[in-house]
């Protein structure tokens, strides 16, 4: 029998042969278990698309300009928006890479190996990678980064992903303002993150975890030069294809290409992000006038305005990108779960999709698990029910409803449109919502602290990753302040189950908790789209809104 890196891979082959899983599911699962993409594609009788790219065919030189917000970046390990990561990722890189088909590959890693029980992950670092300033990338660099994001004093959202298999919570011996015990966290053992040799790192986990390679591509999980100690700006050292030469918050980011980059490309001489502000019309005008060559994102309204421009190509991809109207359960109006249930019953999802997205989406189910996620469990759908929602409010002590502020931002316009339709529908059950549309810079400061807020969440290939980031107790990105011990326990259990069918049985319980007790109203899953000038070559829209400028070129 052919030797595979994990004993479960032959089972996956049998399941694919029997039609129990699709070829794409096989590719996703087998590569997580350490099978190379080339080998996985060979098993399914396909050619790895990345092997077809020919650098010789790409035009060389020129400057590419993409319209995107340029936010303040305090520390790459704290990056909390895709736009911030796009600024950083041209300079600093990741150990892994999840492509637009949700297949995860080694990147700064040569390969990884995982034990049969999913508790030991051995990471083999490429030996040909050098930092821009000349030194080689080593295991010491990787260990420093992994330990840094595991430190609660840093505040990285990666900590929420590592909690449950590398990091454990403990009682800090103090009380918060409400008299509850304060929790902190730490690596579960001294050798949890272990240097094996100069190019090998081992993760010794206390619990099984299937999604480690995808966690290593979570957008704050950059590999930074320890000498920079988390600082980022012009001249920051990185292993990536570009050097940042200028960065002005709210205006632009400018780069020049490295000539000694270890990987593919870059083909451009220079690259630039142009901040076009909060007005969505500015993006349309910038494309029309050729002020920029493309946008990082364009919603359905913008696409409708630009699709007939003769120099423009439109790109679309189905995603697990969404938006949630999330409530703080520790606020008086939202403490009773019946209020949160009523808010969910108040909405007409199809109407929101047609009005806010011009139809470019599919209904969601208030649990942040998409049908495209391999562990999704189908639960009974529930329609809009105004009378039931009103009764729930009355039973919770609000027979006449209540009034509350909802924070959102004006750009992208689909978010504000969604807020307006939600407010109209909440009003039908007696809940008057005052929309507070803040300038983006102000919104970014309060997105986790506002008691009721509309927040967009990006695409992730596994639901367990999103749930860990967004709803695990005390996670840095737990903007809803949700805390449910049963939810946390089930999530940790799901993260260690290899077979997605078995995982979906646990996921059904998690989804039911979210629909019954959870903190969100989730109307839809969104089709992601953008535009590029037809002279831009090599662009392929990533479902996570990521920009990889070293892959792009400008046709002369």
State what each model feature region is.
Residues 191-194, 428-443, 466-534, 556:
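Extracytoplasmic/peripheral linker and loop segments enriched in polar/acidic and small residues
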Residues 66, 134, 287, 297, ...:
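Periplasmic binding protein-like
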Residues 99-103, 173-194, 198-200, 204-272, ...:
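Gly/Pro-rich hinge or "lid" segments in bacterial periplasmic/extracellular proteins
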Residues 1-25, 48-50:
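N-terminal secretory signal peptides
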Residues 245-256, 272-331, 441, 451:
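Extracellular/periplasmic solute-recognition and catalytic clefts
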Residues 362-395, 410-415:
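Structural transition elements
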């Amino acid at each position: 029998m052919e030797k595979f890196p994990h004993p479960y891979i032959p089972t996956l082959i049998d399941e694919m042969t029997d039609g129990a899983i699709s070829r794409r599911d096989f590719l996703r699962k087998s590569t997580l278990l350490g099978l190379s993409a080339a080998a996985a594609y060979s098993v399914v009788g396909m050619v790895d698309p990345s092997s077809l790219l020919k650098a010789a065919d790409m035009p060389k030189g020129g400057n590419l300009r993409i319209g995107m917000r340029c936010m303040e970046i305090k520390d790459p390990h704290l990056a909390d928006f895709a736009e911030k990561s796009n600024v950083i990722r041209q300079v600093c890189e990741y150990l892994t890479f999840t492509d637009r088909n949700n297949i995860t590959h080694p990147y700064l890693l040569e390969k990884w190996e995982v034990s049969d029980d999913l508790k030991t992950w051995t990471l083999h670092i490429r030996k040909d990678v050098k930092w821009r300033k000349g030194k080689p990338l080593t295991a010491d660099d990787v260990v420093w980064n992994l330990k840094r994001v595991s430190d609660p004093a840093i505040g990285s959202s990666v900590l929420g992903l590592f909690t449950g298999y590398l990091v454990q919570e403990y009682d800090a011996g103090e009380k918060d303002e409400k008299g509850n015990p304060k929790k902190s966290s730490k690596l579960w053992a001294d050798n949890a993150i272990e240097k094996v040799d100069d190019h090998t790192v081992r993760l010794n986990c206390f619990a099984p975890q299937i999604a480690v390679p995808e966690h290593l591509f979570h957008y704050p999980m950059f590999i930074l030069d320890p000498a920079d100690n988390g600082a980022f700006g012009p001249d920051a050292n990185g292993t990536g294809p570009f050097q940042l030469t200028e960065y002005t918050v709210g205006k632009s980011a400018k780069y020049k290409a490295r000539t000694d980059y270890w990987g593919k490309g870059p083909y451009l001489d220079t690259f630039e992000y142009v901040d076009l502000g909060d007005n969505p019309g500015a993006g349309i005008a910038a494309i029309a006038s050729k002020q920029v060559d493309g946008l990082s994102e364009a919603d359905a309204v913008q696409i409708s305005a630009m699709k007939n421009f003769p120099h423009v190509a439109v790109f679309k991809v189905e995603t697990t990108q969404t938006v949630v109207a999330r409530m703080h359960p520790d606020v008086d109006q939202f403490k009773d779960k019946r209020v949160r249930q009523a808010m969910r019953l108040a909405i007409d999802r199809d109407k929101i999709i047609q009005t806010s997205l011009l139809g470019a989406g599919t209904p969601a189910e208030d649990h942040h698990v998409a049908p495209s996620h391999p562990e999704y469990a189908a639960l009974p759908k529930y329609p809009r029910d105004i009378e039931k929602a009103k009764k729930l409010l009355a039973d919770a002590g609000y027979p006449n409803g209540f009034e509350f502020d909802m924070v959102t931002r004006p750009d992208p316009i689909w978010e504000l449109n969604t807020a307006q339709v939600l407010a109209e529908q909440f009003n039908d059950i007696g809940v008057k919502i005052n929309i507070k549309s803040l300038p983006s810079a102000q919104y970014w400061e309060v997105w986790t602290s506002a008691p009721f807020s509309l927040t967009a969440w990006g695409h992730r290939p596994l639901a367990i990753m999103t749930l860990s980031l967004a709803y695990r107790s005390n996670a840095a990105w737990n903007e809803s302040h949700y805390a449910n011990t049963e939810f946390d326990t089930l999530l940790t259990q799901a993260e260690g189950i290899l077979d997605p069918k078995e995982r979906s049985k646990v996921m059904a319980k998690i989804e039911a908790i979210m629909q019954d007790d959870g903190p969100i109203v989730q109307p839809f899953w969104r089709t992601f789209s953008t535009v590029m000038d037809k002279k831009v070559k090599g662009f392929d829209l990533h479902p996570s809104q990521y920009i990889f400028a070293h892959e792009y070129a400008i046709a002369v």
